[in-house]
Amino acid sequence: MTTAKESRIAPAEAPWPESIQARFQKLTPLRLFRVLARDERLFARFVDGGFLDRGHLSLRERELTILTVCARCRSEYEWGVHVHFFAKKAGFSEAEIASTLKPSASAAWSGRDALIVRLCDALQDRCEIAEDFWTELRASFAEMALLELLLLIGKYRQVCILTNALALLPEKDAPRFPLPA
């Protein structure tokens, strides 16, 4: 949870270079994107490496993966962005969204959802997957879906490192992590 009053690297403001302006016609110019917009090459490399398209995972599976990774990495910024823009579209209840913030919460999920949470936990804890767990994953996911899950988890760990290291302030209207009791 960030307590900074401003991001460590200030976001760029309009007018943006033409190549970036063209991208902002298609995606919301969030604070993270605007920080990266300070350099056209970094912006393009980052945005082009995304996984928000229709891939081998359902919207729900993709967003559960992202929310779980962001929660485990304590990236309030990115977790809030995905709750705000995607959680309802993916069909998550408020209780399910809250569950993503609980460490080792796979017991709160069932089926493929539980496997996704366990996979995120395993990779967060050890950056490897035990052979018996891989066999379990292979029984439930196609190879390309597993490959996409691994890439998605890696991508969002990168995003979390970036957002946390930059101490990005939450986006307007994005939910925050609950305060500890």
Give the residues covered by each predicted segment.
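Secretory/endomembrane lumenal or extracellular ectodomains immediately following the signal peptide
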Residues: 1-61, 178-181
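Alpha-helical scaffold segments that form or flank carboxylate-/histidine-based iron centers
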Residues: 27-31, 59-74, 145-150
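Short alpha-helical scaffolding segments that buttress acidic/His motifs in well-ordered protein cores
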Residues: 36, 46, 50, 64-70, ...
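Short amphipathic alpha-helical segments and their helix-coil junctions
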Residues: 41-56, 99-102, 130-139
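Conserved alpha-helical segments that form or flank metal/cofactor-binding pockets of metalloenzymes
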Residues: 61-95
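Acidic/His metal-coordination segments adjacent to aromatic residues that form catalytic metal sites
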Residues: 101-110
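Acidic/histidine-rich alpha-helical segments that form the ligand environment
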Residues: 109-150
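Acidic, carboxylate-rich catalytic segments that either coordinate divalent cations
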Residues: 138, 162-181
